Swiss-Prot record:
It comes from Delftia acidovorans (strain DSM 14801 / SPH-1). NCBIfam families: gatC. The keyword Protein biosynthesis applies. This is Aspartyl/glutamyl-tRNA(Asn/Gln) amidotransferase subunit C. Heterotrimer of A, B and C subunits. Its EC number is 6.3.5.-. The keyword ATP-binding applies. It is an enzyme of class 6 (ligase).
Length: 99
């Protein structure tokens, strides 16, 4: 996958960024380099490799100490929302940012 100048202009527009031509050219090179690395990684055959849950597990047996998934703090929604400019039915209201 290779991007072109129009792709960079579209991405910048979607992100509401104003890029100079120099910045646009630099971004094009950096993103294409990144996608080149991703393509190389995708080309590697990993069909015989077991998934890892921890990088150290590849070289030694480890026992993960996982805790139970329980709430450890009381509900503080009301306290957290006191300083919010707008709240409705327990949710923060924010301005619309996507047209």
């Amino acid at each position: 996958m290779a991007l072109n100048a129009q792709d960079i202009a579209r991405i910048a527009n979607l992100a509401r960024l104003e890029l100079s031509s120099t910045e646009s050219e630099r971004m094009l090179g950096q993103l294409n380099d990144f996608f080149g690395i991703v393509e190389k990684m995708q080309a590697v055959d990993t069909s015989g490799v077991s998934p890892l849950s921890h990088p150290v597990a590849a070289i030694q047996d480890i026992a993960l100490r996982l805790r139970e998934d329980i709430a450890s703090e009381p509900d503080q929604r009301d306290a957290n929302q006191r300083s919010a400019p707008a709240v409705e039915r327990g949710l923060f209201l924010v301005p619309k940012v996507i047209e």
